Amino acid sequence: KTTHSFWNFEPRTLSTNRQELLDRFWELQQSNNYDIIFCPSSYDNHQDHQTVYNEVFRAFKHCTILGYEMPWNNRTFRTDVFVSLTIDDLNAKVKMLDCYKTQLERAFMCKEYVMDIARTRGLQVGKKYVESFEAIRIINPL
């Protein structure tokens, strides 16, 4: 089951709204049985992304947590987990990026960039398209 929601926090205010963010994550954690949580990498330099990472780590203690790669924000990145993608997966990802209306003019939001990163990660593991993640917490590894 995939779930998502949009919360209307103002940009660059999550650190001052940290407790509310944690409370919302805690409520989600209590009302759902998540197998895996995706969040910004622990190496992400953006202040809001750091807050999300910290509060996800606190709230979802019993879930696998993977940090996603955002090269324009990451100081460095550990490519611990590699997941093969299809072209349909990549097209769906590009479509989802359209939800970030305020970011659409940024170079890293274009389809070519998404494809280039997927191809680069694929080269590392002998696949056509791959997304890599930082293993923040792994529960019951395969």
Give the label of every model feature segment.
Residues H62-W72:
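Histidine/lysine/aspartate-rich catalytic loop segments that bind and position anionic ligands
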Residues K1-T64, T120-R121, V125-K128:
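Active-site beta-strand->loop->alpha-helix modules in alpha/beta enzyme cores, enriched
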Residues K1-T2, S31-N32, I36, M70-L142:
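The feature marks non-catalytic terminal segments
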